[in-house]
Amino acid sequence: MSLPADQTPSSNLPLPLVQFADRYKADLIPLSGNFSYFCAASLPFTEEDTRDYLEEPVAALPPAVLSRLPKISILIVPYLTHEKSDKASVSMVAPPDEKLSWTAQIRNNKETVLAFTYNGHDVSEYHYRFYQHISNLLWDLKDANARSRFSALLVEEGNAGVHGEVDEESWRTKQQLQRRNGKVKADSKIFIEYLKASFVDTMTLYLHGICCDIDVDTGPRQLPSRYLRKRLQLLQELFPPPVDYYVLPEDMKSSSRK
């Protein structure tokens, strides 16, 4: 559902995302819990798209995640573009590739706006970026128990000389950490940077795996499966999936036998 075409920007000039979000704040459509959304009317956004891009990803969020999140507005727009200031704008026409952004956000103390480019955005990539935003929000909530227990896993992996990571950012920060000679304290800046990247990347994978049947990339940079499983089991304990949702194959098999 969206506004009639004459109520959305007709100019080809990009509109700053902050202004776009403010202009259509009153037109947000409730989705579920603390989520709402707005879709630009110029888009061919069907009921199937509403299910794939909005309803299913939100429905798959664990209750323990939903209860911690602030109010979140999702904006689906034709294109997001950024200038030298890196501040995002909404564009009705395709920007040059070097100025295209797939996603952007606005955050304050009370609510968060998550905006996504629709045109050319594969639904699987959209899910990944959506859950990456959610994972970053969770990290910023500073859950002491989650951080402490995940940190302990990383220390255990480090002591065992475990190679690899989940995604690019955690791999990059792990390499930086490993280039340091000697032991690195768990409260040091470089370890905290790695802890954040690893938590966000692993949490993104965990949430995406609840929603969809995804394949984990294999290769020399990938965390060995038994260590990845331990991380997912920890996140499953901290943030159990909704009823009838599963992450690990054995959980689905166990449920089917009941």
Q: What do the predicted segments below correspond to?
A:
Residues Q175-N181, S188:
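Alpha-helical membrane-anchoring segments
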Residues L114-Y131, S188-F191:
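Short pre-active-site segment immediately N-terminal to the catalytic Zn-binding motif
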